């Protein structure tokens, strides 16, 4: 009997999801069973964990189970568990508001295109709300472990829900009654639903029972043993796939499956997956890791534990430890030596698998890198990472060969006498290919790696070498393409002579530009462009400085060096005029500097003056 009832409105965000569920065109609607079974299993896992320190919570009912029943006459599917249960506040928070960050990410990804948005349903998994794809009303009855009150939550998904106190006789746990839509009544077919439940339950460690058609006898559908505890030889590829999909709310198949039992000083079992598709929350501010920690088959936590490094947060799966005590507090897991050893072993194993894939399946590895390379490179900024091992699995775009290559491949293709790894960073690889910074290097068939992820500008400041080879930006002032492959005394002498010979030219540019530039030098790397900006070895890289300005970490850009190409016709003309004592090229000098700034993505100091100079030159050309 209902005692008191409150009517409430869903959060606006929940309303958006429910609207999509109710009008869903998603073809694989049966995932609602996956979501509800997974939630029921989680509820049992949570109570099993809490009962380790408070056995009264499971007094008289310590055998966890999930039951599924079809009531065809009333058009209902009933899912029942004896897990942790919910009180009134829990029902409001968990079912009336956005309680799961993954669901919030789902909302952010909605495009307004119904076809695309329906595809997102399968990629995200939206938990309980998926019920409304097949039901026009959902009734949830729940009693929280350790509490006496029973509460009933009910909604048709059309903007409002009710929460009621009830004096109904009800044991601990949660019961969900789905009132199935007429057009979805095929889900009331006993054999079809049994098949669906079985397909989603085989890996669940809680026994799942399905009532027969008469509604009297329970038939256990799953083995109720944790999948990772079984020998690999007894697990099919399909079982691995289904476990992965249930665990990660995914529709893709795993790219790599790692099922290992570690024996020795530290005993643990891991069943880990690398997805084949990019996860939507990879760069979410929460940066949550999706690997669950179990201790002796008891679920402990998947939050706020340092089980895997942040840069491997794309991993999905479970780790089950034999060495940690069951009664360990979550706070004690923060700096636990056993957990640290498990983390190191897993990291080593994952990097080993990636190295193997990179060598054996480069095309597959390129796809993986496009999805997760940005996250993986974050590890190069962390002090505790084995940077060289991580760099071994990194790949980058080659400017010379227009394909992804590793640092080891780059080194193997060094030109004779070359000892430095060159790179250029920017937002767009096509723009980088046309940059004057690398034209000289490429003309000598010296490769340049193109860095286009923001994280690249950070990790190169931490990792200046790889296997004793310097990693150097092509924007540096001291690059001499002639000396890159030869260190002869003769070329050093020629270089000094060149600087002295063009002193008249560099002084004129410096006098004209003043504080807009730090120094003006003769370039040893340009072959066709008139000029480019450059920075000294001690200075911050240009793109890194720009990023810090955007983030308001520093106030203003520093003055850059301007490098001139004496073989360029424009520079040659200015130099010849100077030798003839003609110093009337100030506007052209400013235009050359402005052009160098634009090519480097730097702001022009005076856009009005730049526009006037450009117009003047165009007018002279056509008159």
UniProtKB/Swiss-Prot annotation:
Region span, C: 547-623
Keyword flag Chaperone: yes
Superkingdom per UniProt: Bacteria
Residue ranges, annotated region (B): 331-546
Pfam families assigned: HATPase_c_3, HSP90
Coiled-coil intervals: none
Gene expressing this chain: htpG
Annotated stretches, region: A: 1-330
This protein's name: Chaperone protein HtpG
One Gene Ontology term, aspect cellular component: cytoplasm
GO molecular-function term, one example from the UniProt record: unfolded protein binding
Basic and acidic residues: bias regions: 488-497
Listed Gene3D superfamilies: 3.30.230.80, 3.40.50.11260, Heat shock protein 90, C-terminal domain, Histidine kinase-like ATPase, C-terminal domain
Main location: cytoplasm
Quaternary structure note: Homodimer.
Renumbered residue ranges of the record's region Disordered: 477-497
UniProt similarity note: Belongs to the heat shock protein 90 family.
Subcellular location: Cytoplasm
Keywords: ATP-binding, Chaperone, Cytoplasm, Nucleotide-binding, Stress response
Job description of the protein: Molecular chaperone. Has ATPase activity.
PROSITE patterns assigned: HSP90 (PS00298)
InterPro entries to which the protein is assigned, alphabetical: HATPase_C_sf, Heat_shock_protein_90_CS, HSP90_C, Hsp90_fam, Hsp90_N, Ribosomal_Su5_D2-typ_SF
């Amino acid at each position: 009997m209902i005692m008191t009832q409150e009517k409430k409105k869903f959060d606006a965000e929940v309303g958006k999801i429910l609207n999509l569920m109710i009008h869903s065109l998603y073809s694989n609607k049966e995932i609602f069973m996956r979501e509800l079974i997974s939630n029921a299993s989680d509820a049992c896992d949570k109570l099993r964990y809490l009962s380790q320190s408070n056995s009264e919570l499971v007094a008289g009912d310590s055998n966890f189970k999930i039951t599924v029943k079809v009531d065809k006459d009333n058009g209902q599917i009933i899912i029942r568990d004896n897990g942790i249960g919910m009180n009134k506040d829990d029902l409001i928070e968990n079912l009336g508001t956005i309680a799961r960050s993954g669901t919030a990410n789902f909302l952010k990804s909605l495009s307004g295109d119904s076809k695309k948005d329906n595809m997102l349903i399968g990629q995200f998994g939206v938990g309980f709300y998926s019920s409304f794809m097949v039901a026009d009303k959902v009734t949830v009855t729940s009693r929280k472990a350790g509490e006496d009150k029973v509460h009933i939550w009910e909604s048709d998904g059309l903007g409002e829900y009710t929460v009621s106190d009830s004096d109904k006789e009800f044991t601990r746990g949660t019961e969900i009654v789905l009132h199935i839509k007429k057009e979805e009544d095929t889900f009331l077919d006993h054999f079809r639903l049994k098949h669906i439940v079985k397909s989603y339950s085989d890996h669940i460690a809680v026994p799942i029972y399905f009532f027969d058609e008469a509604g009297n006898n329970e038939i256990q559908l799953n083995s109720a043993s944790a999948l990772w505890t079984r020998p690999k030889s007894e697990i099919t590829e399909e079982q691995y796939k289904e476990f992965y999909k249930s665990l990660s709310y995914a529709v893709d198949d795993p790219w790599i499956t790692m099922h290992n039992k570690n024996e020795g000083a530290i005993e643990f079992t891991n069943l880990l997956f690398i997805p084949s598709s990019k996860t939507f929350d990879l760069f979410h501010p929460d940066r949550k890791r999706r690997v669950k920690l179990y201790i002796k088959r008891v679920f402990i936590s998947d939050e706020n534990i340092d089980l895997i490094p942040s840069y491997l947060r794309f991993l999905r799966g479970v780790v089950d430890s034999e060495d940690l005590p069951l009664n360990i507090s979550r706070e004690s897991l923060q700096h636990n030596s056993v957990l640290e050893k498990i983390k190191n072993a897993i990291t080593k194993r994952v990097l080993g698998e990636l190295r193997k894939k990179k060598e054996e399946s480069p095309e597959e590895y390129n796809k993986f890198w496009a999805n997760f390379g940005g996250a993986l490179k974050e590890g190069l900024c962390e002090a505790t990472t084995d940077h060289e091992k991580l760099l071994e699995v990194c790949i980058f775009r080659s400017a010379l060969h227009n394909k992804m290559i590793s640092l080891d491949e780059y080194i193997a293709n060094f030109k004779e006498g070359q000892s430095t790894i060159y790179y250029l960073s920017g937002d767009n690889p096509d723009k980088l290919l046309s940059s004057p910074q690398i034209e000289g290097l490429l003309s000598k068939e010296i490769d340049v790696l193109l860095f286009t992820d923001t994280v690249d500008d950070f990790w190169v400041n931490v990792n200046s070498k790889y296997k004793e080879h310097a990693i150097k930006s092509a924007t540096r002032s001291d690059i001499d393409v002639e000396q890159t492959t030869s260190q002869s005394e003769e070329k050093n002498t020629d270089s000094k002579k060149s600087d002295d010979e063009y002193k008249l030219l560099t002084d004129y540019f410096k006098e004209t530009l003043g504080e807009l530039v730090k120094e003006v030098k003769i370039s040893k790397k340009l072959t066709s462009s008139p000029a480019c900006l450059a920075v000294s070895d001690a200075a911050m890289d240009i793109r890194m400085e720009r990023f810090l300005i955007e983030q308001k970490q520093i106030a203003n850009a520093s003055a850059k060096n301007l490098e001139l190409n004496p073989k360029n016709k424009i520079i040659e003309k200015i130099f010849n005029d100077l030798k003839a004592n003609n110093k009337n090229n100030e506007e052209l000098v400013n235009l050359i500097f402005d052009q160098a700034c634009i090519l480097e993505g730097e702001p022009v100091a005076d856009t009005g003056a730049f526009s006037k100079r450009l117009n003047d030159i165009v007018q002279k050309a056509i008159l």
